[in-house]
A protein has these predicted regions:
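Short, structured active-site-proximal loop/turn typified by the sulfatase FGly-forming signature C/S-X-P-X-R
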Residues: 35-79, 121-123
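Active-site-proximal N-terminal segment of extracellular/periplasmic enzymes that hydrolyze or transfer
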Residues: 2-54
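His/Asp/Glu-rich, glycine-adjacent segments
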Residues: 76-216, 275
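Single conserved hydrophobic/aromatic residue that forms the stacking wall/gate
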Residues: 268-279
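Metal-dependent active-site segment of extracytoplasmic phospho-/sulfohydrolases and closely related
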Residues: 23, 45, 224-264
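Short acidic, glycine/proline-rich loop/turn micro-motifs
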Residues: 214-219, 256
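Catalytic metal-binding/acid-base residues of hydrolase active sites
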Residues: 29, 215, 249-251
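Anion (oxyanion) recognition and catalysis
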Residues: 50, 116, 237
C-alpha cells in the first residue's frame, strides 16, 4: 500500500514518518528520576538523547492520571475533546463507579488509528490491560498491519483480537507479576522484537508506575529500573527509528522529611457556625 504524505487527526496534521516513530510513555516519570539516574551514570543513552535531541518539561493534562494523559498523547487533545476525564467515572444512571477503559467513553480518534487508516503498520504494547482497548481503538487485526497487547495478559492474546497469538510465547518471556518492574521490562522487550519482525511505522510503548509509587528517585529500586530502561533504549537506537520518551504524569512523595503526611488541610465552615470540617 502506498502511504500518504500526512494524516489529519483531531484537526492536527501529522507527517507520515520516514522511519519508525516510537513514543515511549514512562508512567509516573517525575523528571527527578531521570536527573538522578543520569547524574550517576546509569542512563548514557538517554543522556545522549538529551544532549543531541530536544529536551522539554511538559505539562500533564488535568486530572493528572494515567488514562486521561495517555489518551491525550494518543489523540493530541485534552480530555474535553477525547472524553477520558479520569481513571474512573461515576455513572449517575447506575450509581456505580466505572473504570474508564471502555472504548464507548472515547470521543475522538487516536493518531494511531488515523495512521493505520492511511496504510501504516501500527504496534503498541501496554503494561496493564486497562489501556490497551482505548489506545488500540480503530485498529483492525485481520490485515496484518496492527498488533496491540498488554504485558498483563500477554498469554491470552489472539491474532483476531491483538494481531499476535499468545504474545508471551511469541516473546519467549513469562507473564510477569502485575506489581513489578518486570511488567514494564516485558513491554520494552516486546518493542525490540516488534521492530525486528513486524517493522512497524508507528509504535507506542506504555509502562506501569509500580516502581515510581514504591521508590523515590534516590532509592536503589528506582535506579535499577531506569538503568534497565536505558539498556533497552540503547537497543532501540540500533534500529532506524525516531524516539520520543515522555511521561503521563509525575510523582511526588506523600510524606515530608519528618514522615508527616504532605497534605494541605483546609477548614471549611458549614451551616452551623460551631462546626467545621478538616479535609
Amino acid at each position: 500500500m502506498t502511504l500518504v504524505p500526512h494524516v489529519i487527526a483531531n484537526e492536527r496534521t501529522y507527517p507520515m514518518p520516514k522511519r519508525c516513530a516510537i513514543a515511549i510513555c514512562l508512567d509516573g516519570c517525575e523528571p527527578e528520576y531521570l536527573d538522578v539516574a543520569i547524574a550517576e551514570g546509569l542512563m548514557p543513552n538517554l543522556q545522549m538523547m538529551r544532549e543531541t535531541g530536544t529536551d522539554r518539561i511538559a505539562h500533564s493534562v488535568i486530572p493528572s492520571f494515567t488514562n486521561p494523559n495517555n489518551l491525550s498523547i494518543a489523540t493530541g487533545r485534552p480530555p474535553a475533546v477525547h472524553g477520558i476525564c479520569g481513571n474512573y467515572l461515576f455513572d449517575p444512571d447506575t450509581g456505580e463507579e466505572v473504570m474508564m477503559n471502555d472504548v464507548r467513553f472515547l470521543r475522538a480518534p487516536t493518531v494511531f488509528s488515523r495512521f493505520y487508516e492511511a496504510g501504516a503498520r501500527v504496534a503498541m504494547v501496554t503494561a496493564k490491560d486497562k489501556l490497551r482497548a482505548l489506545l488500540s481503538a480503530g485498529l483492525k487485526f485481520d490485515e496484518g498491519r496492527a498488533i496491540a497487547f498488554s504485558a498483563e495478559r500477554a498469554d491470552e492474546t489472539s491474532v483476531a483480537n491483538n494481531g499476535v497469538e499468545n504474545a508471551s510465547e511469541w516473546l519467549g518471556m513469562p507473564v510477569p507479576e502485575v506489581y513489578s518492574a518486570e511488567l514494564s521490562e516485558f513491554v520494552f522487550a516486546a518493542g525490540i522484537k516488534l521492530l525486528t519482525e513486524m517493522k512497524p511505522d508507528i509504535m507506542y510503548l506504555s509502562t506501569t508506575d509500580y516502581v515510581q509509587h514504591k521508590f523515590s528517585p534516590q532509592e536503589q529500586g528506582a535506579k535499577d529500573f531506569y538503568a534497565m530502561f536505558d539498556r533497552y533504549l540503547g537497543e532501540l537506537q540500533k534500529f532506524d527509528v525516531a524516539i520520543v520518551v515522555t511521561a503521563d504524569h509525575g510523582m511526588k512523595p506523600k510524606h515530608d522529611d519528618n514522615k508527616k503526611p504532605a497534605v494541605i488541610l483546609s477548614l471549611i465552615h458549614i451551616s452551623e457556625p460551631t462546626r467545621q470540617a478538616e479535609i
